[in-house]
């Protein structure tokens, strides 16, 4: 039974201003920050036409992996449903109609929280995207896939899903066949698509060009044999840094995008901000970007870059705060695409940024929970923030060493509780063997490196 009444657009127009007061965040040392571009009311976001359905999809999509959390009476983490409703109301009133979730997001709570917020509106007025998250080899079965789809339909309170994805294709083609083809899962999903339970079928991609080319060959073979496409869309990581300067073992985004464009597949963009890192770039890079366009936020550069490619249908953003939502709505209402001169400028900024020793963590939390209590994303986020702000000294001979040492240690203890810090890591490797980090980070190795660095800082502090 739906626990909230349906609202019309007219009933909630203007509610967003009140919602912003309900959204707060605690600033802890080197925690991420982000600026808003304007206090004026945004307009309606730009849309693009889906080539298969002909329907208009908002170019700005809502990523539902980072809904705000709160505590219940027993101190347990739960999604702040009231705030989620306010965010969805404000986004929907400005034309955002694409909402992306997954069974594993927020410890399995995201799908239903998203559905509760959206269930107050006519089902045909928005698009739902969710995923088959069969990461563990024990889940490579048709029974698991069928049950997960059934659970998603139930959690989302719907009898169809607009965009369904094979979640995180991040290995070789043989692994893809093992996960989805040889066990009958792909045939089952194609059958569900033919029945209308799934309106579009695609996959999210985290591997290299060779694997993507093999997938596209597989796609074309199916299309030749059946007369219809195997896949309707692909989700990929696309941003101005990864375009030519991928910070991990994945291929450059430009090359992956070119393959998809050649095959005519629409692209859904994930990580346009690299987990927030492109809205919090090193100071001297931020200064140049602000000088180039004083009225634009750093985040708006990233979103406009991602959306300035003609084959991109939708750009996702995990907007957990009203100020971020408003800023993004300004960017997309209407979308002003970047010209070549602005793209060249971002390429120069990417070259500068590539010289920084950052860890390519996007805070997806696929590595969590750690069996030994580490807050892996928080440790990496803090480290990257301090690198950007110049608080990571190369040696004790650095003239700023004492100041930097204090800034790093004080902010570290504020950002990450002692019982969750890097020195708790025992290199059990559960975070890499069970979670399949999309960024291919050698998490235990990085934890040892950070732990050693912090130990040196603390030792020198006592001398």
Predicted region positions:
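N-terminal binding-site loop/beta-alpha segment at the start of enzyme catalytic domains
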Residues: 2-126, 187-188, 194
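Twin-arginine (Tat) signal peptide motif
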Residues: 6-13, 367, 425-431
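Conserved, mostly hydrophobic/aromatic
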Residues: 50, 62, 99, 114, ...
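Structural preference for beta-strand elements that scaffold enzyme active sites
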Residues: 57-61, 98, 125-129, 160-163, ...
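Short, acidic/polar
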Residues: 77-91, 141-155, 209-215, 299-303
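Active-site groove signature of glycoside hydrolases
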Residues: 156-175
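Beta/alpha (TIM)-barrel catalytic core signal, keyed to glycine-rich beta->alpha loops juxtaposed to Asp/Glu
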Residues: 169-381, 388-408, 439-445
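Short Fe-S-cluster ligation motifs
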Residues: 391-430, 459-463
């Amino acid at each position: 039974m739906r626990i909230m009444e349906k609202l019309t657009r007219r009933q909630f127009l203007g509610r967003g201003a009140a919602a912003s007061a309900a959204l707060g965040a605690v600033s802890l040392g080197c925690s991420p920050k982000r600026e808003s571009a304007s206090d004026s009311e945004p307009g309606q976001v730009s849309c693009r036409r889906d080539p298969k359905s002909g329907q208009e999809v908002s170019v700005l999509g809502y990523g539902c992996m980072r809904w705000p959390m709160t505590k219940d009476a027993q101190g347990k983490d739960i999604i702040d449903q009231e705030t989620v409703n306010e965010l969805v109301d404000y986004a929907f009133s400005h034309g955002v109609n694409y909402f992306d979730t997954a069974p594993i997001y927020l410890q399995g709570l995201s799908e239903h929280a998203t559905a509760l917020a959206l269930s107050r509106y006519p089902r045909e007025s928005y698009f739902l995207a969710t995923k088959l998250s069969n990461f563990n080899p024990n889940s490579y079965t048709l029974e698991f896939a069928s049950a997960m789809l059934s659970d998603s339909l139930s959690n989302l309170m719907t009898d169809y899903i607009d965009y369904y994805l094979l979640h995180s294709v991040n290995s070789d083609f043989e692994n893809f066949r093992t996960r989805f083809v040889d066990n009958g899962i792909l045939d089952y999903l194609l059958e569900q698509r033919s029945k209308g339970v799934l309106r579009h079928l695609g996959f999210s991609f985290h591997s290299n060009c060779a694997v993507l080319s093999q997938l596209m060959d597989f796609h074309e073979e199916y299309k030749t044999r059946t007369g219809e496409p195997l896949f309707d869309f692909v989700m990929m990581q696309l941003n101005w840094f990864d375009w030519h300067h991928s910070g991990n073992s994945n291929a450059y985004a430009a090359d992956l995008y070119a393959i998809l464009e050649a095959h005519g597949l629409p692209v859904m963009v994930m990580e346009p901000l690299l987990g927030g890192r492109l809205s919090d770039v090193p100071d001297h890079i931020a200064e140049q970007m602000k000088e180039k366009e004083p009225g634009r936020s750093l985040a708006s550069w990233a979103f406009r870059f991602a959306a300035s490619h003609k084959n991109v249908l939708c750009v996702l953003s995990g907007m957990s705060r009203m100020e971020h939502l408003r800023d993004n709505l300004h960017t997309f209402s209407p979308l002003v695409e970047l010209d070549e001169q602005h793209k060249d400028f971002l390429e120069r900024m990417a070259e500068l940024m590539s010289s920084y020793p950052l860890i390519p963590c996007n805070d997806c939390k696929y590595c969590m929970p750690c069996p030994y209590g580490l807050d892996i994303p928080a440790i990496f986020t803090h480290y990257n923030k301090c690198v950007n702000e110049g608080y990571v000294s190369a040696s004790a001979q650095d003239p700023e060493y004492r100041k930097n040492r204090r800034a790093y240690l004080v902010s570290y203890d504020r950002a990450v509780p002692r019982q969750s810090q890097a020195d708790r890591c025992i290199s059990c490797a559960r975070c890499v063997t069970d979670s399949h980090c999309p960024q291919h980070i050698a998490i235990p190795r990085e934890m040892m490196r950070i732990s050693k660095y912090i130990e040196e800082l603390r030792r020198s502090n006592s001398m």
